[in-house]
């Protein structure tokens, strides 16, 4: 097991991301957010886009999981947008990420053989770079492990793809996590819809080797929205 992966076992990763339509968009804000996460005891960080990764790496000294989102005009349920190509992977690796994360789902637009070719190409070009497989189903987890080019399996996309959206859970997908732990030997990162301490307790009891938390920490408008919506329900507004 890679030493960087070992550092994250039994740990908490905080995802620091902001989009152009939000006030916190910008590398300086993400670096500040990452510093706050490290101050709070985070074991690792997840950052998006080369410029943000460079800023976060300069501000913090804990492992950074790098992704490179490339959005298209189609339905997000059908699009591969988390580090979808070798070129997008190269950009964040050269920006200094410690672990590369990419979409390892199987789609109509990209069958497994194409994904396998991408993973082999990345491993050949960057043999020392640990790879996290962001996926949505048990089948994808098993196939990703079988390639021998993946170091961590992550439930990042559970509920966010066409073939998993119908079974999307309100909180983290505990059943998927349990199934992956039974079927695979690689470390499993629980990620997606972990909002409360109760959610964290559930994924830990289900066997998660590490946990990544994003919106519940780093997206203030969504955090606010949850409280506001609950308040509205209380007053039937």
Residue spans of the language-model regions?
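Conserved N-terminal beta1-alpha1 strand-loop-helix module at the mouth
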Residues: 1-90, 139-152, 195, 232
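C-terminal alpha-helical cap/extension of soluble enzyme domains
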Residues: 4-5, 10-24, 170-237
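Conserved beta-strand positions in the central sheet of alpha/beta enzyme cores
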Residues: 13, 46, 100-102, 132, ...
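Glycine-rich phosphate-binding active-site loops on the catalytic face of alpha/beta enzymes
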Residues: 17, 68-72, 91, 95-109, ...
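Active-site-adjacent beta->alpha loops and helix N-cap segments on the catalytic face
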Residues: 24-27, 46-66, 79-84, 104-122, ...
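Glycine-enriched alpha-helix->loop->beta-strand junction motifs that scaffold or abut catalytic
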Residues: 41, 60-64, 94-99, 125-128, ...
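Short beta-strand elements of ligand-binding domains
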Residues: 65-68, 133, 189-192
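A contiguous pocket-lining binding segment that forms or flanks enzyme active sites
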Residues: 122, 127-134
């Amino acid at each position: 097991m890679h030493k960087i992966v070992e550092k994250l076992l039994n740990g908490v990763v905080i995802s620091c991301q902001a989009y152009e339509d939000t006030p916190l968009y910008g590398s300086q804000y993400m670096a500040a957010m990452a510093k706050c996460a490290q101050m709070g005891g985070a074991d690792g960080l997840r950052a998006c886009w080369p410029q943000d990764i460079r800023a976060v790496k300069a501000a913090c000294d804990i492992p950074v999981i790098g992704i490179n989102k490339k959005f298209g005009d189609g339905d997000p349920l059908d699009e591969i947008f988390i580090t979808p190509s070798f070129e997008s992977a190269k950009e964040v690796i050269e920006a200094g990420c410690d672990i590369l994360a990419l979409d390892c789902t199987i789609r109509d637009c990209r069958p497994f053989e194409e994904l396998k070719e991408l993973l082999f190409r990345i491993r050949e070009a960057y043999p020392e770079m640990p790879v996290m497989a962001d996926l949505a189903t048990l089948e994808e987890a098993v196939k990703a492990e079988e390639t021998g080019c993946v170091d961590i399996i992550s439930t990042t996309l559970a509920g966010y793809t066409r073939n998993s959206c119908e079974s999307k859970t309100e909180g983290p997908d505990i059943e998927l996590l349990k199934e992956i732990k039974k079927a695979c030997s690689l470390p499993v990162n629980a990620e997606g819809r972990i909002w409360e301490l109760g959610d964290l307790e559930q994924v830990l009891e289900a066997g998660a080797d590490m946990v990544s938390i994003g919106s519940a920490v780093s997206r203030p408008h969504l955090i606010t929205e949850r409280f506001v919506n609950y308040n509205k329900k209380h007053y039937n507004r």
